[in-house]
Amino acid sequence: EMSASLVGSEMCIRDRFSVNISKPGVTKGQHWHHTKWEFFIVVSGKALIQQRRIDTDEVLNFEVSGDKIEAVHMLPGYTHNIINLSDTCDLVTLMWANEAFDPNCPDTYFLPVE
């Protein structure tokens, strides 16, 4: 019984984590969420994470690197992206969301940051 409970918890946690690999110069994201929030943690490479509240023009820029691990919080109502700043190296990012992706209610809306 305890084992089944642990497996259920692990499944829930695993569904909310993803590892994303971006080629040099690639921008990913350009979307926002109504309720979902996320953490982006670059574990290898260098990136620019940008966020903008959807009702403003002010862009928040976070330069991050796998050399100094830190989490950047993506808030609901903020369009966001992540840009691989390298010309030669892949960017590896660990992403966590507070809720698992639901294809029937994706809560993901395209909107460029800039």
Predicted regions located by residue number:
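Short beta-strand His + acidic residue motifs that chelate non-heme Fe in jelly-roll/DSBH
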Residues: 29-31, 49-50, 71-74, 80-87
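Single conserved hydrophobic/aromatic residue that forms the stacking wall/gate
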Residues: 1-13
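Structural motif
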Residues: 10, 46-48, 68
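Glycine- and acidic-residue-biased ligand/ion/polar-headgroup-sensing regions
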Residues: 35-52
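Short histidine-centered beta-strand/loop micro-motifs
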Residues: 28-34, 41, 62-64, 83-85
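Short acidic-glycine-tyrosine-enriched beta hairpin
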Residues: 54-76
